[in-house]
Amino acid sequence: MNGMTRRERQVFDINEIIKILDKSKVLHLGLVDGDEPYVVPMNYGYIMEDGKLTIYLHGANRGRKLDLIRANPKVFFELDCDIVPFEGDVACNYGITYASIMGRGIAEIVEDVEEKKLALSVLMKTQTGKDFEFEEKMTKIVTIIKINTLE
């Protein structure tokens, strides 16, 4: 995969990446539906361990997203924050500043109850900053998607 055109804007520092992950609230998940792209916005949680990013998503127990992941687990994701539009004297001077993360990964549907409980706790911590605990019965009403990031 090619890198960014504006390489001076690329973020490599793990602490900066974590700041973006903590500030953002919506991840755009890119999937493949046959020969068509399909993107869905989702809440997420993450674990950064030894420089490796693992992302957890949750959703309904059935639907298009799960069908697509089962057919092709290769995914692309994007999330952004700090969106600030700016103006100029001419049209070409208008723009937006933002921070974002994009990457590829392999998605898997989590079946293990303990990992599902962990994923839900991580997701809620990322979204709210609060700690929550989940009982086994709560894990049965949602599907957890785990993205093992590749970059």
Where are these regions (language model features)?
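Extreme N-terminal tail/first-helix region
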Residues: M1-D22
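Charged, gly/pro-rich active-site loop segments
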Residues: N2-R6, I83-E151
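Short Pro/Gly-enriched beta-strand edge/turn motifs at strand-loop
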Residues: V11-D13, K23-H28, Q127-K130
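A generic structural signal for nonpolar/aromatic side chains embedded in well-ordered alpha-helices
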Residues: I20-L21, L68-I69, L123
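Short beta-strand segments
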Residues: S24-N61
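Short conserved beta-strand and strand-loop elements enriched in small hydrophobics
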Residues: L29, V75-L79
